[in-house]
Amino acid sequence: MVEDVELNRLYWHSRRGMLELDVLLVPFVREVYPHLNETDRECYRKLLECEDQDMFGWFMERSESEDPELQRMVRMILDRVQPK
């Protein structure tokens, strides 16, 4: 189980100041992150260490991360919001 302190910290780190990222990351950390396994949680935390411009490109599907684990996390976040 994820502690409230960790979720609060991740919530604030997920607020990037770029609306396009905020609308993807904030709901993900609130609704999905608590149910992830530890490997995926670690990957999400690693994603938050990336530059906003890099993440913007990945989420807009203009580029891909060289790290396959980060790309998998980006896909997981996008799959959550894109119509099937």
Curated annotation (Swiss-Prot):
SUPFAM superfamilies: YgfY-like. This is FAD assembly factor SdhE. It is found in: Cytoplasm. Keywords: Chaperone, Cytoplasm. Belongs to the SdhE FAD assembly factor family. An FAD assembly protein, which accelerates covalent attachment of the cofactor into other proteins. Plays an essential role in the assembly of succinate dehydrogenase (SDH, respiratory complex II), an enzyme complex that is a component of both the tricarboxylic acid cycle and the electron transport chain, and which couples the oxidation of succinate to fumarate with the reduction of ubiquinone (coenzyme Q) to ubiquinol. Required for flavinylation (covalent attachment of FAD) of the flavoprotein subunit SdhA of SDH and other flavinylated proteins as well. Its main location: cytoplasm. The keyword Chaperone applies. It comes from Pseudomonas fluorescens (strain ATCC BAA-477 / NRRL B-23932 / Pf-5). It comes from the Bacteria. GO terms for cellular component: cytoplasm. Pfam families: Sdh5.
